[in-house]
Amino acid sequence: MNGNISAYRNKITALPATVAANGTFGGNGVESVIGHPNGAQVGYVADGIFKSQAEIDNHATQEGAGLGRIRWRDLDGNGVINEKDQQWIYDPTPAFSYGLNIYLEYKNFDLTMFWQGVQGVDVISDLKKETDLWSGLNIGFLNKGKRVLDAWSPTNPDSDIPALSRDDVNNEKRVSTYFVENGSFLKLRNLQIGYNVPQNFAKKMKMERLRLYLSAQNLLTIKSKDFTGVDPENPNYGYPIPLNLTFGINVSF
């Protein structure tokens, strides 16, 4: 058995003078600013759902506010929700990564496992735009996730999923903490079980060694219970990481 653990940190320390004055905007909230990690994002802070008219009346002026709509936090306290109510909300750098190799033998059997994990990492779960927001990407042939069945409504007032709406009047697809989730995971990257056929039997078949094995890749994923997607390693629209099963034979003559 052997394992490893590693960690790294990154921070932008210098930019061209013409860029450093304002930072660079890479789209989707990504900004390059001295003193902050590369790939970090700014955005709005989602502060729950408006569940009563009193909550709306007592909140800062927010365009699109309504029952069942996401409430944005008034960070500067000026009583109006605008672009100044943004802060750093996302850092793609994990706290640490780790791995564990295990090899076991018992009589003619052997077992190999490789576990790999990432801890303390943020992910942007863009798929929530399809699982939580009916307006989503507004593409007619796309299905919606089953989470929309639990959306806020007068008969489901305890839900934290926005009310169904065809129009995104509250701009709920904006970059915000609503889409930032815990992307920590532990994966069984490789599992192999082997059997060495007894040598006297192998020699009867004119072989020095005969081994049969069954292996699987990406067999198991352990993730945070707070992650709403399928795979925190692939939280958006990428092709799913496949499960591979292989049966093989090793022969020596």
Task: List each language-model region with its residue ranges.
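Conserved small-residue
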Residues: 1-92, 132, 151
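Transmembrane beta-strands of outer-membrane beta-barrel pores
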Residues: 5-11, 106-108, 117-121, 190, ...
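Extracytoplasmic gating/loop element in the C-terminal half of outer-membrane beta-barrel translocons
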Residues: 118-212
